[in-house]
Amino acid sequence: MKKRLALLMALVMVFSLCCFSAPAAFADGKTVINVMSFTDEVPNMINRFVETHPDFADKYEINTTIIATTDGLYQPALDQALASGGADAPDLYCAEAAFILKYAQGDMAEYAAAYEDLGIDVAAEIEAAQIAPYSVEIGTRPSDGKVVGLGYQATGGAFIYRRSIAKDVFGSDDPAVVAEAIGAGTQSWDKFFEAAAALKEKGYAIVSGDGDIWHAIENSSDQGWIVDGKLNIDPKREAFLDLSKQLKDNGYHNDTQDWTEAWYADMAGIGDQPVFGFYGPAWLINYVMAGNSGGSAPGEGTYGDWAVCPSNVGFFWGGTWLLANKDTTKAEAVAEIIKWITLDATEDGLQYGWANGTWSGEQGTKDTVASGAVMAVSNGELDFLGGQNMFEAFVPANEYANGSNLTQYDETINNYWRDAVRQYTAGELSRDDAINAFKTNVADNLDVEVDF
């Protein structure tokens, strides 16, 4: 899910993690569990599990392969590893929102083990932990109705804004005031653009680039890219063409692209125009914005000058699901790991420590997690947000998270669409030509029926 780690993972690939090393490489007699991921997030969680479960550590060794999603490298490598099978195949693997359906419901779903076949009482565990319904929905295989994957985060989105700019333009940094200004809950962009005009008058950009509204649009659409085997352009996604052009033509953003240095610079307030806000889940704050704010304590850079309010459109963005190989010979051990990360709602589980910031390292930042039972007893106050409890905004936002608009081709098709939109807003293509170029890319590169 988190492209913030793309560069790091590209560097990691230089080392031996690029491919599976043979289980025989471990000479201590332990059983090897192969793990495959696209960032170090889940591997770090598993390492923590091993550290806190000495009996498990006495019997098992974790062999990790990390391949970044950069340049589309992860999925082909995972597909080959699953199809090839054998001792080097992953016992446990990860998939993010952009391609989870491929592995839980699509072309590669046959390789996933049902959680119940691993010995997990999945229905009872889900009920006890109050797991977010969309996480279960996305991880359920249609062919047999069985859960084959669960996430550990809840990724409902909100609007994250600069307090100082809110005071200057709207007279208050109160989340209720800003929510009203951007039209929170209206499922419309009308008030947002009224706010953009007011911000522009005082020299501010409302967002950094069109990508900042894309994720809200993409994940609030009613239908996905594929309907009944044919390419489908949901009206809300088609409207992105016009909304993006409106942003650019009026100078309402800095025309950056997400996951670039210019985008990060706007988080620190050092871009072309000071940027008012970003759309995203809690993980965007913890793992992207905080580290790019130009400081590490209130008063440094923009650190502490942020707050969160409900979004004008309900959406979610991201998430990672854990799946097990149906052919694993270590089902009991794999089940222990999966349960601790995705289903354990006790104070000893990953999710409680993560939600409350009691772990060290990356999982030491507070985050919204999939367990409603954990969220009910967790505190989301952050210095980065001026002491605001972010859970007050993010927990209600999770009601908008669902898997109904996801497809197994999202990562690829999203890239085609956003490229076409940028060509249109730059004046390189007409609106109709941009849509046709997008359709041509899909038709030429994917096994999807396209109407022109």
PLM region descriptions:
Residues 137-159, 183-232, 236-238, 273:
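Extracytoplasmic/periplasmic solute-binding protein
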Residues 191-200, 228-262, 289, 302-307:
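Glycine-centered hinge/linker elements that transmit conformational signals in sensory
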Residues 9, 13-17:
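Hydrophobic core
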Residues 26, 110-112, 116-117, 286, ...:
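Mature extracytoplasmic/periplasmic domains
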Residues 75-89, 105-106, 166, 193-199, ...:
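Short helices/loops that flank or line small-molecule/ion binding pockets
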Residues 31, 58-60, 64, 83-86, ...:
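Extracytoplasmic/periplasmic substrate-recognition and gating elements
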Residues 95-158, 300-309:
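Hinge/lid segment of periplasmic solute-binding proteins
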Residues 4-6, 18-105, 124, 345-352, ...:
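Conserved N-terminal structural module of periplasmic/extracytoplasmic solute-binding proteins
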